[in-house]
Design a protein with these regions (language model features):
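Alpha-helical transmembrane segments and their helix-start/interface "positive-inside/aromatic belt" motifs
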Residues: 1-3, 162-171
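Terminal transmembrane helical anchor/hairpin motif
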Residues: 5-46, 169-241
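Secretory targeting signals
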Residues: 5-7, 98-149, 153-154, 158
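Long, hydrophobic alpha-helical segments
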Residues: 50-75, 171
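Hydrophobic/aromatic residues in alpha-helical transmembrane segments
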Residues: 63-70, 118, 151-152, 198, ...
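Short alpha-helical transmembrane interface motifs in multi-pass membrane proteins
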Residues: 64-67, 103, 107, 133-138, ...
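Transmembrane helix boundary and interhelical loop/hinge segments in multi-pass membrane proteins
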Residues: 67-87, 101
Length: 241
């Protein structure tokens, strides 16, 4: 909230077009690498938030929380040799891991909601026009992308029982996904690979300006459900001794 207050206060006090003039002098490849296929647009409040907040900062917050929580969901107790004791209580493995996943989802939801409410209220307070639907759309994508990487982390944790490995692998996937989404459009022969990146579906179509995309939320839901299912299966059959 304080970050949103600071950023919107500064934006309300300066002429954004001056920044855009500077950005326009940069090579297109550089702006696409930094901010993705849509490039950098400092000519509007949406463009500034898109480039400065929702390209790197917000995803780092959401993915870090989700991956950290997901990686520790079962691996922490397993590493501490306390998981078998917990499961000796009247609770099934499925119930245990589901509760941990719901905890991860709630934390990620909190991060996304704070971003939506903070920037919406600050823009209203400083009389800056911003689309409530667009802000909701980018925060929804932020939430769904965080959960997707969080579920990958949960699954890795059920494979080896090591939270450090789970967090590192899922975090690595997130970094690779970001690089693919930003680099692929710069090379014609690699352009098709952007469709394998969750970051592409996160920002493609410019949700902050145009709202929720018709189907770009589907890859997030699909990946989350797939990794939720295989995590349940793997955890159910895993030997905890």
């Amino acid at each position: 909230s304080l970050l949103a207050l600071y950023i919107i206060f500064v934006l309300s006090s300066i002429e954004l077009n001056a920044f855009q003039t500077i950005i326009d002098s940069f090579p297109k490849a550089l702006t696409q690498f930094i901010a993705g296929e849509s490039g950098i647009d400092f000519g509007s409040i949406e463009g500034f938030l898109n480039a400065q907040i929702f390209t790197i900062m917000a995803p780092i917050f959401a993915i870090s929380v989700a991956v950290n929580s997901g990686g520790k969901s079962t691996a922490n107790e397993e590493s501490a040799k306390s998981l078998d004791i917990i499961l000796s209580a009247p609770i099934t493995r499925e119930s245990f891991i589901t509760q941990k996943i719901l905890s991860m989802i709630s934390k990620t939801f909190f991060i996304a909601t704070v971003h939506w409410i903070s920037y919406f209220l600050m823009c209203k307070f400083f009389s800056e026009n911003i689309s409530a639907e667009g802000l909701f759309a980018i925060c929804l994508n932020l939430f769904l992308m965080g959960i997707s990487f969080g579920m990958i982390s949960v699954y890795i944790g059920t494979l080896n029982g090591n939270s450090t490995n789970a967090i590192a692998v899922a975090g690595g996937f997130a970094l690779i996904s970001y690089l693919i989404a930003n680099i692929a459009p710069l090379v014609d022969s690699l352009d098709f690979t952007k469709y394998f990146s969750l970051f592409y579906y996160y920002k493609s179509g410019d949700p902050l300006k145009f709202g929720v995309h018709n189907w770009h939320w589907l890859p997030f839901v699909g990946i989350s459900l797939i990794f939720f299912t295989i995590s349940l299966i793997q955890f159910r059959k895993r030997n905890l001794l």
